[in-house]
Swiss-Prot record:
It catalyses: L-citrulline + L-aspartate + ATP = 2-(N(omega)-L-arginino)succinate + AMP + diphosphate + H(+). Its main location: cytoplasm. One of its GO terms (biological process) is argininosuccinate metabolic process. It is an enzyme of class 6 (ligase). It is found in: Cytoplasm. Pathway: Amino-acid biosynthesis; L-arginine biosynthesis; L-arginine from L-ornithine and carbamoyl phosphate: step 2/3. It comes from Dickeya dadantii (strain 3937) (Erwinia chrysanthemi (strain 3937)). GO terms for molecular function: argininosuccinate synthase activity; ATP binding; protein homodimerization activity. This is Argininosuccinate synthase. The gene is argG. Belongs to the argininosuccinate synthase family. Type 2 subfamily.
């Protein structure tokens, strides 16, 4: 039996993820007028561009919501964000700049917490504003059904009746006005923005064209670091972790993770830290482009990875990066709570994050320009005395190194023979492409005789 309802279920309760914007306002009012019983649920994700959350449920009731609830998701959102940092769960990077999966993290929290609230109210039909071309429609679908196995999905934007009547923003605005609501359509921007307290996403419209750069974006979490008229003085900041968890900024200890992240956002935002331009692969394999902000996540990530490289050995770091990228892709696909993701999270948090205790001092300048000034940890395996170039007591002697190099003769000989075989078969040409002049030592011995 299908879980997706193509037409409005008249007379039934429908929970709508209500943002208070034009789209969800018009959808809620339309559903009520057509005979459904809408319930509105708003997630408080600490969006930097939202200044009055309490007003949103009130507006929902004015538009016909049977009930409207504001669900505080900030604590859970920050917990998932810190888990992502601990695991390095980020797979989209361009030129060393990272996308911190802030929208996928927000969807994981929203999709589970709102549906759980609906279930408490006996609401088993859910609608949201995601479109059929994007990632969110699948993320919300997965998280919703994971939370409530009896859930049915109704999306006005998949209903041809709704689209025929209110297919565009102009039609929605006129509908609100003729229904007696003085709803003023916000000014059209050159792009759309979606945000939570972990980060902001700017995409679509003009940003679909690659000749439209970051310079058309007005940051909501940072500053226009590319604008020479914006003064951004350098700033030192110290970040402290205990067992993989960020606990202090500039010597100030935080007992509330939400407040710590807000302060990290303020510090990083003053410099435009964590802003990136990414071309990515959506779940449906089509490529899209986005401009992202995540100043606090970037600050914590930089300090965390500095400690990772100073504490763990090479093989552990390699596994951290490999599994982190794999986990990041699962997160992006809406599989953050799937068994394969939980397995990776557990391993990375248990064996990598648990050892990350220490303090990193950075100097932040403009954008992603920064320097690491100091790294302090009792767990560091970086010990300069082991490799010092100065005369003194050493953990190994010249004779020890001679023995170690002699043991390399075995694999050097094997490699030389393999290279000769490749030359003989025509796979490579001796002396080309930076390869050494390769000769078969056995043939050389015969010619010498």
């Amino acid at each position: 039996m299908t879980t997706i309802l193509k037409h409005l279920p008249v007379g039934q309760r429908i929970g709508i993820a209500f943002s208070g914007g034009l789209d969800t306002s018009a959808a809620l009012l339309w559903m009520r007028q057509k005979g459904a019983v809408p319930y509105a649920y708003t997630a408080n994700l600490g969006q930097p561009d939202e200044d009055d959350y309490d007003a949103i449920p009130r507006r929902a009731k004015e538009y016909g919501a049977e009930n409207a609830r504001l669900i505080d998701c900030r604590k859970q959102l920050v917990a998932e964000g810190i888990a992502a940092i601990q695991c390095g769960a980020f797979h989209n990077t361009t030129g060393g700049m990272t996308y911190f999966n802030t929208t996928p993290l927000g969807r994981a929290v929203t999709g589970t917490m709102l549906v759980a609230a609906m279930k408490e109210d006996g609401v088993n039909i859910w609608g949201d504003g995601s479109t059929y071309k994007g990632n969110d429609i699948e993320r919300f679908y997965r998280y919703g059904l994971l939370t409530n196995a009896e859930l049915k999905i109704y999306k006005p934007w998949l209903d041809t009746d709704f689209i025929d009547e209110l297919g565009g923003r102009q039609e929605m605005s006129e509908f609100m006005t003729t229904s007696g609501f003085d709803y003023k359509m916000s000014a059209e921007k050159a792009y759309s923005t979606d945000s939570n307290m972990l980060g902001a996403t700017h995409e679509a419209k003009d940003l679909e064209f690659l000749n439209s750069s970051v310079k058309i974006v007005n940051p909501i979490m940072g500053v226009k670091f590319w604008d020479e008229n914006v003064r951004i003085p350098a700033e030192e900041v110290t970040v402290r972790f205990e067992r993989g968890h960020p606990v202090a900024l500039n010597g100030q200890t935080f007992s509330d993770d939400v407040e710590l992240l807000l302060e990290a956002n303020r510090i990083g935002g003053r410099h435009g830290l964590g802003m990136s331009d990414q071309i990515e692969n959506r779940i449906i394999e089509a490529k899209s482009r986005g401009i992202y902000e995540a100043p606090g996540m970037a600050l914590l990530h930089i300090a965390y990875e500095r400690l990772v490289t100073g504490i763990h050995n090479e093989d552990t770091i390699e596994q951290y990066h490999a599994h982190g990228r794999q986990l990041g892709r699962l997160l992006y696909q809406g599989r953050w709570f799937d068994p394969q993701a939980l397995m990776l999270r557990d391993a990375l948090q248990r064996w990598v994050a648990s050892e990350i205790t220490g303090e990193v001092t950075l100097e932040l300048r403009r954008g992603n320009d920064y320097s690491i000034l100091n790294t302090v940890s009792d767990n560091l395996t970086y010990k300069p005395e082991r490799l010092t170039m100065e005369k003194g007591e050493s953990v190994f002697s010249p004779d020890d190194r001679i023995g170690q190099l002699t043991m390399r003769n075995l694999d050097i000989t094997d490699t030389r023979e393999k290279l000769f075989n490749y030359v003989e078969s025509g796979l490579i040409f001796s002396g080309n492409a930076g390869l050494p002049q390769v000769a078969n030592p056995s043939l050389q011995d015969k010619s010498a005789k």
